[in-house]
């Protein structure tokens, strides 16, 4: 919810478009009806997106073309390693650091595809979190772009789709910042422009846990959008006037658009929701 509010307001404040894309490339993990629930909630809260809703699964041909380009350029290779094979591999903040086992050769019948990394740091300047650097070779190793089960990996899909849609600015939760260097690396290999990145702090509960389904948070309520939007603005440090707490959605959005200032979140990584109801809400719109 917070990332949706922040990205929407930031796009509008800069005179840009706010595009809505459903990431539906992992059917085994998708819950039936989840996408429709999110769209219903966004509409209920008064979000207005530009153009039609797009679905990541509709871009499969473009994803495959990107994979083909990486293979033809010698930037990707087949990998037959299983989780068991990598059980003794070193681990870092991003998980297993792939040791390059299949770089030279892979004889497996079924294989994933990994993209080559090197020892150069990938860097970017985040609008809120400042300068960031990551050496992919030592922190993640060569990473998967096409899974053994035939599905496209998220890192590649989101990069291709951002390129297809002409995305220039990305505002999202800081829990996704570790993915950014891998996405920038793919942009460089594929010759894509790199968007400007802005990672907002994630909401946590009173135990310091990120709000998520795994920690018992609930769906975004549809019966009190005004109250929840007001609380979201407070949580994002925007200080809406008290009288807006009893105002309609249109008035709350109008104030938010006039007064939006994302820089009040500068360098923050965690925030605690102002409203108990918001603290109990899952981060499903981020």
What residue spans do the PLM features occupy?
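N-terminal Rossmann-like or analogous alpha/beta NTP/dinucleotide-binding catalytic cores
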Residues: 1-91, 174-175, 179-192, 244-249, ...
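Non-catalytic terminal extensions that flank enzyme cores
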Residues: 13, 107, 120, 209-286
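Noncatalytic linker/hinge segments flanking ATPase motor cores
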Residues: 59-64, 155-156, 160, 200-201, ...
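Active-site cores that bind ATP or allylic diphosphates and position pyrophosphate for catalysis
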Residues: 78, 83-222, 240, 277-286
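Bulky hydrophobic/aromatic packing residues
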Residues: 4, 8, 18-19, 25, ...
